[in-house]
């Protein structure tokens, strides 16, 4: 990834603060935040801690003459930037750094950011829906929602931002929706969606067509894996089947 290209993208983010009262440059705060989050930070205090630990390295690329801002400052500044403009900037930078190849698996999933809930301000937790490249271990794009229940509307927005042609898109049961499947097809990609009780008729059709005994004697293409998880041995069976009318 090019650090200079990240700095170039960050530098065009509008700063709406009163310049006479500014101690830390916006570009420095955003650079610190992006680097810390990439390194695994998901709380404001963790971003500040990352800054103190990596201050000498950060100084090579940004203006940190006034040191590292405290977590409250980071939270306030990041919360007040144009989130849509920053989101667009970040996705463009990630796509510049990462070339998606045909046949890649892209996992779409939601995550609630720890520490984003503010009871005093009656502010709900922030929920992010992200597209993750399994091949390269990077997030290709993300969309913010106010609640996990809004994933259904956020996923199509995220799909619109990405180039997905000839890739496989995986989504959990929340994304098992006709509109989402159609959107993926429109993007010339394939999909692998989980089917659970939220799709009652479809779930019932799958259970009837694929009872457990079918898997143990399946005659078509299949694959199985075994692993120990949470103290129990799990066997996962995968089969390839043609789509029949009851599954449409």
Swiss-Prot record:
UniProt keyword terms in alphabetical order: DNA recombination, DNA-binding, Transposable element, Transposition
GO annotation, biological process: DNA transposition
InterPro entries reported in the protein's UniProt record: ISAs1_transpos (IPR047647), Transposase_11 (IPR002559), Transposase_11-like (IPR051698), YbfD_N (IPR032806)
A Pfam family reported for this protein in Swiss-Prot or TrEMBL: DDE_Tnp_1_assoc
Additional comment: Missing up to 50 C-terminal residues compared to orthologs.
Family: Belongs to the transposase 11 family.
Name of protein: Putative transposase YncI
Organismal lineage: Bacteria, Pseudomonadati, Pseudomonadota, Gammaproteobacteria, Enterobacterales
Gene: yncI
């Amino acid at each position: 990834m090019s650090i200079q290209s990240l700095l170039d993208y960050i530098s065009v983010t509008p700063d709406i603060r009163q310049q006479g009262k500014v101690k830390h440059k916006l570009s420095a705060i955003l650079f610190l935040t992006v680097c810390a989050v990439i390194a695994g930070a998901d709380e404001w205090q963790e971003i500040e801690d990352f800054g103190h630990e990596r201050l000498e390295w950060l100084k090579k690329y940004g203006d940190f003459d006034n040191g590292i801002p405290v977590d409250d400052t980071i939270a306030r500044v990041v919360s007040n930037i144009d989130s849509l403009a920053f989101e667009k900037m970040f996705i463009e930078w990630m796509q510049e750094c990462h070339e998606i190849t045909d046949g890649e698996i892209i996992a779409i999933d939601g995550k609630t950011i720890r520490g984003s809930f503010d009871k005093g301000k009656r502010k709900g937790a922030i929920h992010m829906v992200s597209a993750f490249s399994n091949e390269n271990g990077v997030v290709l794009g993300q969309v913010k929602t106010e609640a996990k229940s809004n994933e259904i509307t956020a996923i199509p927005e995220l799909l619109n931002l990405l180039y997905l042609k000839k890739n496989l898109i995986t989504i959990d049961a929340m994304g098992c929706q006709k509109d989402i499947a159609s959107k993926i097809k429109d993007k010339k990609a394939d999909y692998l969606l989980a089917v659970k009780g939220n799709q009652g008729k479809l779930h019932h059709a799958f259970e009837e067509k694929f009872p457990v005994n079918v898997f143990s004697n399946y005659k078509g293409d299949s694959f199985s894996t075994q692993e120990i998880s949470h103290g129990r041995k799990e066997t996962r069976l995968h089969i390839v089947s043609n789509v029949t009318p009851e599954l449409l």
